[in-house]
Amino acid sequence: MGQKAKAQAPTTHPRPHTLSSQVAPALPRRPRHAAPESLRQARGEVMKAHLITYGCQMNEYDTHLVQSQLVSFGADIVESPDEADFVLVNTCAVRGKPVDKVRSLLGDLRKQKAQRSLVVGMMGCLAQLEEGQQIARKFEVDVLLGPGSLLDIGAALESNERFWGLQFKDELHDHIPPPPSGKLQAHLTIMRGCDHHCTYCIVPTTRGPQVSRHPDDILRELDMQLAAGVREVTLLGQNVNAYGVDQGAKLKGYPSFADLLRMVGASGIERVKFTTSHPMNFTEDVAAAIGETPAICEFVHLPVQSGSDRVLRRMAREYNREKYLTHIAQIKKHIPDVVLATDIIVGFPGETEEDFQDTLSLYDEVGYDSAYMFIYSPRPGTPSYKHFQDLPRELKTERLQRLIARQKDWSARKNAQKVGTVQQVLLRGDAHDAGFLEGHTRGNHPTVVPKAIGADGAGVYQVRIDHATPHMMYGHILGPDGQPLPEQPRFNPEAAAVGGALPML
C-alpha cells in the first residue's frame, strides 16, 4: 500500500453536547527504544506500520480510520508484523477471550522489542479500561489510544515518551477517512458510544455516551465511497435505532434512523445494511423504510439476548419478550422475505433451566436464519460482574451446545428454502479454492460459486442457488439470459469449503 493519501478535512457542526474527558497519567520514558522523532525518521527511512484488529465492525472501521491517518503522514502499511517498525493492535473488551488473545500477542511483541527497534501500540475498547492499562504497563506498550482519541496517532508517534490518549474528543466524530481502495464493501459509522447501560456490557464505559454524526458528514463519506466503486455499505453504530437522539435529547436537524435509511438508500448505492439494533429503540418506521427502499437489504439483525423476561430484567435490556415479538411481527409485515439474525447470551447469572427453555421457545416462535451465540463472560467494571454470581462454566457450555443445535436446525431449514431460487450475491474474490469465488447474498448468507467465463472476479451477480448447508450456500452465476454461465473449473462444493469456523449459524 505505501501510497500517500490526504486526510479529508473535517467539517464542523455545532455540537449538541461535549463528551467528557479523561486525563492521561504521566508515564515514564521508554525503557528500550525511543519513539521516532517523526514517522519519516524511523531508522532513517519511512516508517512501516502493521495493524491488527480484534472485535466488531466498529473496530474494523476504526482501524481503517487510523490506517488512513498513517498513510497520510507518509507511513507504509506492511502485511506482516515482522516487517514493521510500528505494530498497532486494535482491541476488543466485550468478552474475556479477545482480551486473552491481546495478552498473548503483546507478549510476543515484547520479545521482539528486546531484539529490534519496534514501537508497539494498543487502541480500542480494552485500552480505555483500567484492565487494559495494566496490560499495557506489563507488556511495555508505547502508544495507548482509547476509542475517542484515535486522531492522536500522529502526536503519539512523534512523542519521545510513552503516549496515552484516553479522552473522548468531538473532532473524531466529524473526521471523514478516505474510502477503502479497490473494495466493493465499506463500513460507515453513523454514531459512536451508547446511552443504554445493560448490566453485562462494558461498551458505555469504553466508547462513552452516544454521539450521532451529522447527516451531512455521513452523506459526504458515502459519496466518497460511491466514487471509489463501493457497491455495498454497512451503517455502523452501537444502537443505530437511536440515531439522532443523544442522551435523551432529539437533535435539531438530524433525521430519524428510518429517514436516514431512506436518504442513504436514495444515494445511488446498490446495497445497504446496518448494525447493531437495540429492540428498545426499534420502530415500525424502520421496518417500513426497509420494505419500501429497494437498496436496503432484507436483512435485520435484532439482538434479543434472552427469551426470558426475568433474565431480560436482570440484563436491564428495557424491553420484554412480548415487545420484542411485536417488533418481529412488524418486520415480517413490511419485509415478507426478511432474513432474521440475533445475538444470544447463554448462562447469564441467575438463568434457570426454565429461563433457558424460554430462549429455546423464542427460537421456534421467531425462526432465526442465523445467530451469534455466546456463553456469558463476566467483565470487570460491569454491574453484573459486581453484583451477580456467575454460573458454572460446564452448565453454560452445555446450554450453549443445545442452543447451537437448535439454531443449526433452523439454519438448515431456512437455507434449504433458498435452493432453486435466484439471489443477488456480492462476490468479494477467491474462495479457499482459487477456482471458486466467495461472497454473500443480500440476506447475508455466505455463498460460494465456481468461476465462470466472463465472471471470474469480484462483483455483484445473479446466482442460482443449487445446494445449501446450515452454514453455506452453493450456486452458479447466471448470465443476462438467466442461464448459468460456462464454468472455468468443474464445480466441486467440497473443494470450495471456506477455511476456518464461521461465526454465525
Swiss-Prot record:
GO terms for cellular component: cytosol. Residues 180-413 form the Radical SAM core domain. Gene3D superfamilies: Methylthiotransferase, N-terminal domain, tm_1862 like domain. Residues 47-162 form the MTTase N-terminal domain. CDD domains: Radical_SAM. InterPro entries: Elp3/MiaA/NifB-like_rSAM, Methylthiotransferase, Methylthiotransferase_CS, Methylthiotransferase_N, Methylthiotransferase_N_sf, MiaB_methiolase, rSAM, rSAM_horseshoe. GO terms for biological process: tRNA methylthiolation. Its main location: cytoplasm. [4Fe-4S] cluster 1 binds at C56, C92, C125. Monomer. Catalyzes the methylthiolation of N6-(dimethylallyl)adenosine (i(6)A), leading to the formation of 2-methylthio-N6-(dimethylallyl)adenosine (ms(2)i(6)A) at position 37 in tRNAs that read codons beginning with uridine. This is tRNA-2-methylthio-N(6)-dimethylallyladenosine synthase. It comes from Deinococcus radiodurans (strain ATCC 13939 / DSM 20539 / JCM 16871 / CCUG 27074 / LMG 4051 / NBRC 15346 / NCIMB 9279 / VKM B-1422 / R1). The lineage of its organism: Bacteria, Thermotogati, Deinococcota, Deinococci, Deinococcales.
